[in-house]
Curated annotation (Swiss-Prot):
Catalyzed reactions: ATP + H2O + a folded polypeptide = ADP + phosphate + an unfolded polypeptide
Coiled coil: none
Any single Pfam family the record assigns to this protein: Cpn60_TCP1
Uppermost EC category: isomerase
GO terms for cellular component: cytoplasm
Protein known as: Chaperonin GroEL
Transmembrane segment boundaries: none
Organism: Exiguobacterium sibiricum (strain DSM 17290 / CCUG 55495 / CIP 109462 / JCM 13490 / 255-15)
GO molecular function, one term: unfolded protein binding
Annotated EC: 5.6.1.7
Keywords: ATP-binding, Chaperone, Cytoplasm, Isomerase, Nucleotide-binding
Species classification: Bacteria, Bacillati, Bacillota, Bacilli, Bacillales
PANTHER family from the UniProt entry: 60 KDA HEAT SHOCK PROTEIN, MITOCHONDRIAL
Family: Belongs to the chaperonin (HSP60) family.
């Protein structure tokens, strides 16, 4: 396919049009008075959102060169979303400001490679200062503030703060769509895995269709049990203790399952069989996790252990086990706290080492089941459109909260960027020429988020930026109430990780943009060109066309 090539100024101008098209659509959403953007969907109702990355991903421009510019800035948003989970609009606003400011200087004859050096130096200094002014997040109230600012909803803030308090930092919080109108929090205490009873005859509560075992013994094996003789010796020991038994095995079938069911119906003893969770190597790891939580020994031939010789001392214990059709929940397992701590440490190391997102997610789930718990935020709304928009906002709020716990918080509303300008200005004393121009580009761009928040609130951005430069550190502009307040005191805060990631990613793409000297794209198809040439009929058939 033929290609079109644009060089230097012409290339950068074409790409800038794409940058502006995308950034202008995204930046209307920033701040407490930011507006929404409506996205067309091929099927179903349109999506209404104020999530920067969702809007950026939707934009596809007709002109190939403009589209490349738009895609570069979309990359800033998606990278920030990947690292911090929020701050995508801020990153887009910063990128646009750096690109526009930088382009003026490159057009005027500045050396883009030296400008790039200045941009990188300024961003490094800004990030150091952000780390220095970040405050660790403490208490449920502070967590609620971060989530409420991100979602622009105090109720959501309280919900996420409660979820994090209940399941801990290592717990898993998932967001699901609910069929009702209200948004609720559902917390699963104890360790839960997605396998239910082997037979419905094992249930003890017919109303809830659950098998509830109080103070049961727990047998864990990676073998398939089809003959009752294999577990008879340990079964007799458990019956003597007059306690129920939970069997977690690769499978329980045939005569073994029939015997367990018959004895349950007769009232001789109460045993519930459950298939082992997971598959392959992950199954073995999950069985080991359950063994550690319950204080059981995993009966496996790899360790030379035989089911027939299992003793009651090798079984685990828990205060309660609830088995439904699809899930098994073990509450207050009898595992030793030192063993659990060691296992948690081992899983954390694996999370750091893995390069696969899927593996990381599964390891995170295992960590949550061992160390914390699982909380489910069930999002409700009146219409499907509102439900999707609300779900996106809650996901952003959850990501922002996690980021805040990791690296602390800074003043929100674009204020932190204004506060780091003094530190960035200090390097101008030792920087000259085009490198100093690069530093000045970053200084100007750092004002852009606050300027845009003010403009979305109907104020003059430049006036507010100038005033804040002369205010004490921590003072900022509350666009929701049109007042100047102490941002952290008022609870208007941003996670330091989100602020840092937005700045670093914006600078990275802007520097690449400014150093672009040629752009190559596919030549558009001529209008009205035939899709396929006329075949003129097939040989010997007199021309079918």
């Amino acid at each position: 396919m033929a290609k079109d090539i644009l060089f230097s100024e012409e290339a950068r101008r074409a790409m800038l049009r794409g940058v502006d098209a995308l950034a202008d659509a995204v930046k209307v959403t920033i701040g407490p008075k930011g507006r929404n953007v409506v996205l067309e969907r091929k099927f179903g109702s349109p999506l209404i959102t104020n999530d920067g990355v969702t809007i950026a991903k939707e934009i596809e421009l007709e002109d190939h060169f403009e589209n490349m510019g738009a895609k570069l800035v979309a990359e800033v948003a998606s990278k920030t979303n990947e690292i911090a989970g929020d701050g995508t609009t801020t990153a887009t606003v910063l990128a646009q400001a750096m690109i526009r400011e930088g382009l003026k200087n490159v057009t005027a004859g500045a050396n883009p490679m030296v400008i790039r050096k200045g941009i990188e130096k300024a961003v490094r200094r800004a990030v150091e200062e952000l780390h220095a002014i970040a405050k660790p997040i403490e208490g449920k109230e502070a967590i609620a503030q971060v989530a409420a600012i991100s979602a622009a909803d105090e109720e959501v803030g309280q919900l996420i703060a409660e979820a994090m308090e209940r399941v801990g930092q290592d717990g898993v919080i998932t967001i699901e769509e609910s069929r009702g109108f209200t948004t609720e929090l559902d917390v699963v205490e104890g360790m839960q895995f997605d396998r239910g009873y082997a037979s419905p005859y094992m249930i003890t509560d017919s109303d809830k269709m659950e098998a509830v075992l109080e103070n049961p013994y727990i047998l864990i094996t990676d073998k398939k049990i089809s003959n009752i003789q294999e577990i008879l010796p340990v079964l007799e020991q458990v019956v003597q203790q007059n306690k129920p038994l939970l069997i977690i095995a690769e499978d329980v079938e045939g005569e073994a399952l029939a015997t367990l069911v018959v004895n349950k119906l007769r009232g001789t003893f109460n045993a519930v069989a459950v298939k082992a969770p997971g598959f392959g190597d992950r199954r073995k790891a999950m069985l080991e996790d359950i063994s550690i939580v319950t204080g059981a020994e995993l009966i496996t031939e790899e360790l030379g252990l035989d089911l027939k010789e299992t003793q009651i001392t090798q079984l685990g214990r828990a205060s309660k086990v609830v088995v439904s059709k699809d899930n098994t929940t073990i509450v207050e397992g009898n595992g030793h706290s030192d063993s659990i701590t060691a296992r948690v440490g081992a899983i954390r190391s694996q999370i750091e080492e893995t390069t696969s997102d899927f593996d990381r997610e599964k390891l995170q789930e295992r960590l949550a089941k061992l160390a914390g718990g699982v909380a489910v935020v069930k999002v409700g709304a009146a219409t499907e459109t509102e439900l999707k928009e609300r779900k996106l906002r809650i996901e952003d709020a959850l990501n922002a909260t996690r980021a805040a716990v990791e690296e602390g918080i800074v003043a929100g509303g674009g204020t932190a960027f204004i506060h780091v300008t003094k530190a960035v200005e200090s390097i101008l004393a030792v920087t000259t020429g085009d490198e100093a121009t690069g530093v000045n580009i970053v200084l100007r761009a750092l004002e852009a988020p606050l300027r845009q928040i003010a403009e979305n609130a109907g104020q003059e951005g430049s006036v507010i930026v100038e005033r804040l430069k002369h205010e004490a550190q921590g003072m900022g502009y509350n666009a929701a109430t049109d007042e100047y307040v102490d941002m952290i005191e008022t609870g208007i805060v941003d996670p330091a990780k989100v602020t840092r990631s937005a700045l670093q990613n914006a600078a990275s793409v802007s520097a690449m943009f400014l150093t672009t000297e040629a752009v190559i794209a596919d030549k558009p198809e001529p209008a009205g060109a035939p899709a396929m040439p006329d075949m003129g009929g097939m040989g010997g058939m007199g021309g079918m066309m």
